[in-house]
Regions:
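N-terminal catalytic or cofactor-binding beta/alpha core of small enzyme domains
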Residues: 1-141, 152-161, 181-234
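Short active-site-adjacent structural elements
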Residues: 15, 144, 172-179
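An accessory alpha-helical subdomain
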Residues: 164-174
Length: 235
């Protein structure tokens, strides 16, 4: 049975009335893309609830693809984030009034986690369909980065793998005007929609090709389970 694609966005923050990631995510509500139903969830912009909310969503939705979207004012194109770091450092308060300075996302967690998106395929598909986009090697140290870090941690032992990524999106034109359009690029909602639709259309066939091989790997792993932290004896 086909699983779902989970797409998330964030509510407005910092006094803004809209958030481009929320607008983009909501535009996909109820859609069927490449045979997969798209499930949409909007997150409060609060650092303390990210882990708990994603943990709950993964159980409720049971997706095999998760795309978290986050607004990144100042960017001029869609940005796929390659890496999330175990750092929380931001001075713009979240919607609970919280800031972070030199903190970590997860105590004892890995320094960084790498997204398993097929980056080159997606960017090539974007460019072929006229969507400006690129791969970013820095998701920052705010809540967007935290989202990707938490998601990768929550899904790292899933078999078959859950394909997980963070998409940073620019301001919408109205936001850029309010912020001072001479120094704040923007992108139309229609172009953002084309971008995330193309992203999903590119990922789903790739996921379906990977699933049989991932299942074989999982079955092979059951033949000899080695607890984490225990090395196999050299032969």
């Amino acid at each position: 049975m086909a699983k779902h694609v989970l797409v998330t966005g964030f509510e407005p923050f910092g006094g803004d009335k809209i958030n481009s990631s929320e607008m983009l995510a909501r535009s996909l509500e109820g859609r069927l893309i490449s045979g997969r139903s798209v499930m949409v969830r909007i997150l409060p912009f609060e650092t303390r609830t990210v882990h708990e909310r994603f943990e709950q969503m993964l159980v409720e939705v049971d997706p095999d693809v998760v795309i978290s979207t986050a607004q990144a004012g100042g960017r001029s194109a869609l940005a796929l984030e390659r890496v999330a770091v175990n750092v929380l450092d931001f001075d713009t308060p979240d919607n609970a009034g919280i800031t972070r300075t030199g903190d970590v996302v997860a105590r004892g967690g890995a320094d960084a986690r790498i997204s398993n998106l097929p980056f080159d395929r997606i960017v090539n598909a974007w460019h072929e369909s006229g969507v400006p986009g690129y791969v970013s090697n820095s998701a920052g140290t705010a809540i967007g980065n935290q989202t990707l870090y938490e998601l990768l941690g929550l899904t790292e032992t899933a078999a078959p793998p859950v394909i997980t990524g963070l998409l940073h999106v620019p301001y919408l034109p109205a936001q850029a005007i309010n912020a001072g359009s001479e120094s704040n690029p923007s992108m139309s909602l229609d172009l953002m929609k084309r971008g995330i639709e193309t992203l999903i259309e590119t990922i789903v066939p790739w996921v379906e090709q990977r699933t049989p091989e991932a299942t074989k790997t999982r079955e092979a792993g059951r033949q000899m389970w080695i607890p984490r932290g225990v090395k196999e004896v050299e032969r």
